[in-house]
Design a protein with these regions (language model features):
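N-terminal basic, amphipathic alpha-helical segments
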Residues: 1-84
Length: 84
């Protein structure tokens, strides 16, 4: 799956911030392509063994920072042009 590379079990700080950081790094390195759809919050939570709230907070931070966007009834997508 798309988030198979994520490993946030070990580390310091809030889990949602570690998830956010790893997704951001994956986008910048090209592992996750621009325009690509992220797994639903429910799917990502199940895959990563995290709460839905944790995944939702990470996704919301991605949107606030301009890395992702939420499209109603479609899901979360990596922006075509990442804002800095």
């Amino acid at each position: 799956m798309l988030l198979d590379f994520i490993n946030i079990k070990n580390g310091e700080g809030a889990v949602y911030l570690r998830l956010y950081g790893q997704i951001t790094a994956a986008v910048k390195s090209g592992i996750i392509k621009q325009g690509e759809k992220l797994p639903s919050i429910r799917e990502a939570a199940a895959q990563l063994n995290l709460s839905r709230t944790t995944v939702e907070n990470a996704y919301l931070k991605l949107c606030i920072e301009g890395t992702a966007e939420s499209l109603p009834q479609r899901g979360y997508f990596i922006r075509i042009k990442i804002m800095k």
